[in-house]
Amino acid sequence: MSEVIYYTSDEVGAPSFSNTVGAFTALLDACLVNGFNARTVTISVTGGVATATASAHGYIADRKLLIEGAANGALNGVTRIATVPSSNTFTFPAPGGADGTALGTITSKRAPLGWDIRHTATNKRVYGRTEPGRNDDVLLVDHTVAATIKYGGAASATGVDTRVEPYGSDANNWCYTTAGVTSPILWT
């Protein structure tokens, strides 16, 4: 069974979502592909537990982070935050991490879901999954008109406007979402 990984609009560094053209593609870029709330951290390891220090990081326990840049490769990769003892520290499991202060230019950020951008144009994307054994199904998103988001799935795509074997007819495959709000929209 896959674990649930989620993000919320109230997290520090989370992208804002509004009726501004491109806001939805920026949100998906952050959550699916790039991550967000990047911080430079220092890490010390004791007994298989890493304690990271980053000023006002805003991270939340049990959320996934991506650690990069540690000279000890055992510390790098996606991990789950174990505890948040203070606004400047958090801990995570560090099996294989040698006791002591980690070397390197180390960064942390909310881990992306592991998708990539197969095709891109201004405020249009074709996203695909990157895990081994995946199929070539893609998510297509068009946020070129304010307050309207077109999205749909397909077996593959050769460009942002060229779908191969879309799921259903265009009427069923492309969904249009329109909202008349002017303030940022809360999201999970």
PLM-predicted stretches and their roles:
Residues 4-8, 14, 29-48, 71-188:
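Small/polar beta-strand repeat architecture
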Residues 54-72:
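Short coil-to-beta transition motif at edge beta-strands of beta-rich domains
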Residues 17-18:
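Predominantly extracellular/luminal regions of secreted and cell-surface proteins
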Residues 47-55:
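Surface-exposed ligand/attachment interfaces on beta-rich extracellular proteins
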